[in-house]
A protein has these predicted regions:
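Hydrophobic transmembrane alpha-helices and their immediate loop junctions
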Residues: 1-220
Length: 220
């Protein structure tokens, strides 16, 4: 994932431009599902903040952070506009935040499974055509691996990624407060790790392993 999108616009022929458009569409889809599911989880736990601010939307423009999107296409990772969550609505704030955070990565894994399933149905039943073949490849080789990558990347326990909020559930309140105090510096840490090339191979192998396992469930 860290370097998946870096060479997106290198060539200018029609086929590569088509591929670029399809990849951008996949990014928008994965980000939108991820952020919307954060809001839905919060709502299910009693927090209406995202709903009242019209963030329970499948319109990607409601979720795109343009700086985060630009970084995604330059350094290989970025972020969306965070869905607002007020933990004061939760009966158990730390646990509520953890469940709300976990909803995003889980939704990405489920989205990958869904699109692998769609690909399987196309493979079994759809008549061949150029358009159907493009959609088939988009489901299997763009949306599914990108969604797996987005889900696993967000499980890294570095603030402000979702994994840090899941980790916080298991920390004492004092340690939780310390972790959240440094949340604003998390993006700088991630940028430094990306620039230094640290962790990329491990994450890439994890993404490939999960994607390959899911792929073989449908195409053994």
């Amino acid at each position: 994932m860290l370097h998946y999108l870096q060479n997106l616009f290198q060539a200018l022929d029609v086929s590569s431009l088509t591929d670029a458009v399809l990849r951008v569409a996949a990014v928008f889809l994965c980000l939108t599902v991820h952020e919307t599911c954060h809001g839905l989880a919060a709502l299910a736990l009693g927090d209406p903040t995202a709903k009242s601010m019209h963030r329970l939307s499948l319109n990607p423009l409601h979720h795109i952070d343009w700086l985060g999107l630009a970084l995604m296409f330059t350094v290989g990772f970025g972020w969306a506009k965070p869905v607002p969550v007020n933990p004061n609505y939760f009966r158990k704030p730390k646990q509520g935040m953890a469940v709300t955070a976990l909803a995003g990565p889980v939704s990405n894994l489920l989205l990958a499974i869904l699109f692998l399933g769609i690909g399987k149905v196309i493979y079994l039943y759809a008549p061949y055509s150029a358009g159907i073949n493009v959609f088939f490849e988009w489901c299997l080789f763009t949306v599914a691996p990108m969604s797996v990558g987005m889900g696993l990347f967000n499980l890294i326990p570095i603030p402000p990624l979702d994994g840090s909020k899941v980790l916080a559930m298991f920390l004492p309140n004092s340690a939780y407060g310390q972790l959240m105090r440094y949340e604003r510096y998390g993006i700088l840490v991630l940028l430094a790790l990306s620039w230094l090339g640290l962790g990329g191979n491990f994450l890439g192998n994890a993404i490939y392993g999960v994607y390959e396992a899911l792929f073989h469930i449908f195409f053994a």
